[in-house]
Amino acid sequence: MEFIHQPYYPGETIAAIATPPGEGGVAIIRISGDQSLEVAAKIFSGPIFSYRSHTAHYGQIYNSSGEHVDDVLVLIMLGKRSYTGENTVEIHCHGGSLITRKVLEVVLAAGARAALPGEFTFKAYMNGKIDLAQAEAVQELICAKNEKALGAAESQLKGSLSNRVLAFQSTLTQIAAILEAWVDFPEEGLEFATMDELDQDLERTAKDMEKLVNSFHNGKILHDGLSICLIGCPNVGKSSLMNALLDKDRAIVSPIPGTTRDVLEDHLRLNGLHIKLSDTAGIREANESVEQEGIRRSKKAMQEADLILLVLDAHKGLEKEDQELLKQVPFHKTIVIWNKIDLNPRNLPCLEVPFLVHLSAKEKIGLEELHQTIDTIIWQDGPPSKEEILITNVRHKEALIESIESLRRVKIGLRHQVSPEFLTLDMRQSLLELGKIIGTNISEDILSAIFSKFCIGK
């Protein structure tokens, strides 16, 4: 079901369970809309209309037949002081799938409509409580996988990204006004000093926007986590290294080549980041069909991974199959690992690779060096600070890139004395793209795609 394509009426009253499904001490049913109090009054034992905003009251819920359903606490939030900007009632009932569903059914029978995914946050956006970037931050807050991602989402929810976009818009609006005046009063022309100032303002703003675009690298890592793939020939110790990184026996370790036939995945936290770790089948020339399929999947996992750990056997040294693998991996995202250094290998060849680590997965020697090397590759310019504004949403990145492209066209146009009518068109387009980020100019299809990702009840 598409969200925005449903008829939307600002005063329509909606309801949904706002807490996760399953058993628990307390569950919350949220009601929001102009008729929230009227709906609650039909089913709650207390004098709903006499309650002040942001007060909680104990009472009972009854169905239309007068049968007792549950003892509850009701929380009243009136008008603009609520999350949605509309009258809101929260019913705090006993947790558990059955009782929670029964209370919701009573609420819906009293006149509320079942909420669509993200509809409460959509109401908050429509009622001016938050802009679109802040609305998206709500979802990112819920889905945050680590402390840094949580901090970035909180910052965006408080308006850090929105304020930066508004600052860009303010500067560009002033430039657009000058260009519009040039169109309206061509006989006045533009002073060369003004032309130079415009060029400088455009360049400075474009560079500031590019910094924000470049923050997407770190933002995406915080938001999505990182996928790391272990590859290598059979019996080089990939499974042992996976177990060492996970600090548990997840993969079967065997001296028999080809034990790992499929991609084995697990998750861990490394320096606060969410990591998906994949152990793959040993890559070699194989005749058996099942092993061939495992090798094909290994190569696919290698291509899709954010980071590759290419494991070599230090005891055996560099073999022909290892050399072939070294030719296939992209070194900018590959750490080459000499494993089994506990066996005192001698005369290891010097490998000219950017990232090289010596360790023993079996004895857990050198793991800290591996952690540090992973950090070095992940954070190209160092980890982000708490104060840094990051974009974590590809939609924001694309809008900024389009806005910058329009500014570049204006700069080129000024340099080549292009008619101001064409320059103003590009300025408007740049502002239009920025407006997409905070929702001042956005299509219904995009809104539908954004809010449909939310859970029901948020």
From Swiss-Prot:
K(+) binds at residues 235, 254, 256, 259. GO terms for cellular component: cytosol. Pfam families: MMR_HSR1, MnmE_helical, TrmE_N. Belongs to the TRAFAC class TrmE-Era-EngA-EngB-Septin-like GTPase superfamily. TrmE GTPase family. PROSITE patterns: G_TRME. Its EC number is 3.6.-.-. (6S)-5-formyl-5,6,7,8-tetrahydrofolate binds at residues 30, 90, 129, 458. Its cofactor is K(+). This is tRNA modification GTPase MnmE. Binds 1 potassium ion per subunit. The keyword Amino-acid biosynthesis does not apply. Exhibits a very high intrinsic GTPase hydrolysis rate. Involved in the addition of a carboxymethylaminomethyl (cmnm) group at the wobble position (U34) of certain tRNAs, forming tRNA-cmnm(5)s(2)U34. Its main location: cytoplasm. One of its GO terms (biological process) is tRNA wobble uridine modification. Homodimer. Heterotetramer of two MnmE and two MnmG subunits.
